[in-house]
Amino acid sequence: MSLSLPPLIAVACLVVALARISWLPLRSWLRRRRRTHQLAAQLPGPRNLPLLGNFHMFFGLEPWQVPHLINQLAKKYDGTFKLKMGSNFSLMMFQPRDIEVVLGSSQLLDKAVEYSFLRGWLNDGLLLSGGRKWHRRRKIITPAFHFRILESYDEIFDRQTRLLIHKWQQTLGHSFDLGHDVHLFTLDVICETAMGVSTNAQTNADSDYVRAVKTISTVLHKRMFNIFYRFDLTYMLTPLAWAERRALNVLHKFTEKIIVQRREELLRGGVTQTTDGADVGAKSKMVFLDILLQSNIDDKPLTNLDIREEVDTFMFEGHDTTSSGITFFFYNIALYPECQRKCVEEIVSVLGKDTETPVTYDLLNNLNYMDLCIKETLRMYPSVPLLGRKVLQECEINGKIIPAGTNIGISPLFLGRSEDISSEPNTFKPERFDVVTSAEKLNPHAYIPFSAGPRNCIGQKFAMLEIKAIAANVLRHYEIEFVGNAEESPVLIAELILRTKDPLMFKLKKRVI
């Protein structure tokens, strides 16, 4: 039975309407893509291939070879160059005047696409959130790093450091991987300051939680450098993705259990009033979780999921980054014995000769030369070697028109090693940061180990105090010696957290003060 003419016309009209509806967004997308390619063509950079973009330049490279390639491109294109990775453009910007604009802009606050690999763990925590949510969360979290709160953490720093010192008595005279132990130390510290509990990582490195954290670190490393793992469609079919899901289940359940327990404890204790954070600084002996549990947004307390996001973010940002900074600090002062000697002299002058004297917030703030050594370490070996921003709307940066959708890459690592910015950039010279005696005027937008602008690292004071605490306690107990070729710089891997290709090995000797 054939259709009559009117139904045929109706079907034809429907097909035409659907085609028009489908064509309009497609046409809009094609226009945007054309505009993106027109603007990108005006930016300097190596030639890219159809479909692959510049992926071919990275084929066959080991992770530790990538920084060398980026450094070559930065020199060739005078510090600014584009890379096309598949269908996405990235613009690397290594000029301080460009960095000042990017990091100082209130319109360039969203993170680059590489950070999405963390979303399974951190969800919409402070590191990954954007827009209004980021502004609100930043406001309520900032008081958690008030100096009165930081003061209350010095007992945790001191106790966990002494556990590490006791553990290291077994290593005296033997070569060992110091960074591995420091990683477990920072994990214990961040768990206790974030949630009020200890994972006992230093005494039980094989716990489910510690192994889950290691798994996530492996996932991040492989997704950064393996093209097969970068795309969700292919990644989700791999055994690594299954391992990640198991690890996330462990991490999330651990945090959620602590949140529920702590909320019940606060309710039993009669602490129910929420705060917008204004009076948090007047409180003491509060861990990060307590502050979140007593905070609100729009007169509503944070949900358990809200709190989990921020606690997990604090955990991620506070243990791996600090561990990297501590390890490279010990590496530098082991290579430069005179700097180690000056640090010890200052420690004795501030803390005295009694090694049982606890390190406190006030005493740590008086370790000025050590502060210079830490800053110089972070110039040479920034814990976060690459910062990324996402351009949501077309913008102009010092005459360069940047298309929407571009990822902007900024490297504290390459800035710190630039001969155009620092004299003898590969030499450890703490005095360059002495504002009184140094003739070297450092550009504030060329030294950004904690980023800069409105989205700078909220926990930088916490990190500096933790590094000082472990450095002060360890150095008054042990002399530190690097085991390896001091003439050769360590081979670096610039992923989300700066690492070395091979572990840095050290020997300890009992110090006599």
UniProtKB/Swiss-Prot annotation:
Induction: By isoquinoline alkaloids and phenobarbital. It is a peripheral membrane protein. It holds the Pfam family p450. It is found in: Endoplasmic reticulum membrane; Microsome membrane. Its EC number is 1.14.-.-. Heme binds at E317, C457. The keyword Glycosyltransferase does not apply. Keywords: Endoplasmic reticulum, Heme, Iron, Membrane, Metal-binding, Microsome, Monooxygenase, Oxidoreductase. InterPro entries: Cyt_P450, Cyt_P450_CS, Cyt_P450_E_grp-I, Cyt_P450_sf, Cytochrome_P450_Monoox. This is Cytochrome P450 4d10.
